[in-house]
Amino acid sequence: MAEHHHTISGLVGKLVTELEVNCNADEYYKIFKHHEDLPNAIPHIYRGVKAVEGDRITSGFIKEWHYIIEGKPLTCKERTTYEDEARTIHHSTVEGVLLDDYKKFDATLVNPKADGHGSIVTWIVEYEKINEDSPVPISYLTFHKIIEDLNTYLCASD
């Protein structure tokens, strides 16, 4: 079951969704760190992803995402950093339509369990709106659907 938290203070906000999964925890971390398989795993959300600056092995590389939110195809470029020890992957948007409404739009995936089955996967979206008219990015809470769909995909390959 997904758990959602939402806080906002003026123009700055944070959205959190957590979901318990029952497949191999390491596979969750790997599929997000080595992102090429995401479009195959969940093509109804991710249409494509590629490294555009640096290589996917080095923390700090930039990748371009093609994805769908609320039925709309979107593209963005993000700088991706990761901490293997903490099993945390951080995406910071550097280009794309998200920056039309937000000065900052960052997404962090936390999957603390290193191996075995079962884990809690957490998505954290932190943002700063350009102005009061910019929407709260509630549609990005649907990332719990990504976690659920990956659970199904990864369990099928266990």
UniProtKB/Swiss-Prot annotation:
Its main location: other. GO terms for biological process: defense response. It is found in: Vacuole; Cytoplasmic vesicle. Pfam families: Bet_v_1. Laticifer. Keywords: Cytoplasmic vesicle, Vacuole. GO terms for cellular component: cytoplasmic vesicle; vacuole. Not known; MLPs constitute up to 50% of the soluble latex protein. Belongs to the MLP family. This is Major latex protein 22. The lineage of its organism: Eukaryota, Viridiplantae, Streptophyta, Embryophyta, Tracheophyta.
